[in-house]
Amino acid sequence: MIVDATLPLLLEYGEAVTSRQIADAAGIAEGTIFRAFSDKDEVIAAVVEKAMDTTALEEALAAIKLDQPFEKCLDAAIAAIQRRVVDIWQLMSSVGPRFHPEKAGPTPISPALTTLFETHRDRLGVKPADAAKFLRALTMSLTHPMLNDAPVSPREVAKLFLYGVHARSASC
C-alpha cells in the first residue's frame, strides 16, 4: 500500500517527495510509514525494488493470445516491453543514482516471450530463446528515451526485427 502509493509521487516529485505526501496518498497516518520503514530512503528503495520486478511484464507477455498472426503477437510483445522500458527510465530518472539497483549479470530471457517464439517457430531463422533475446535488445535500444529523439512504434520495431534494413533479401 505504501509502496504503491509512493510510485506516482516519485515520478512527480523525485526524492523531494515528503513523508506527509506519501501518507496522504496511502491514506494513512505519517507515523505508520515509519513503523513499516526506517526512513523515507527505505520507502524509495522499496519502490525501486518493486518496479524492477519483472513479474508484471512477464504476465503481460503471457497474456498475449498466441493464436493470432505472428506480427500481431510481436506488436503486443513490443508494446509491453516498451511500456516497461519507459516506466523504468522515468522512475530511475526521478531518483538519485544511490537508488539504482546493482545488477549482477544479464537479465534472464523471458519465458513468456520464448513461448511466443516457440509457438511461431516456423517463422524463425534462429532458436526461440535467441529470438526473444534479440527482440528484447532491439526494442529496448529503440525505445530508451536517452537513445532516441522520438518514439519508435511497435510496428516499426517489429518490421525492423523481422526484415532488417536491407531493401532486398540478403544472401549472407
Model-inferred region functions:
Residues A5-E12, E58, F134-P145:
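Solvent-exposed, amphipathic alpha-helical segments
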Residues E59-A63, L91-H100:
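Short linear capping/connector segments at secondary-structure termini
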Residues S94-G96, L135-T139, F161:
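Short alpha-helical scaffolding segments that buttress acidic/His motifs in well-ordered protein cores
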Residues L160-R168:
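C-terminal alpha-helix
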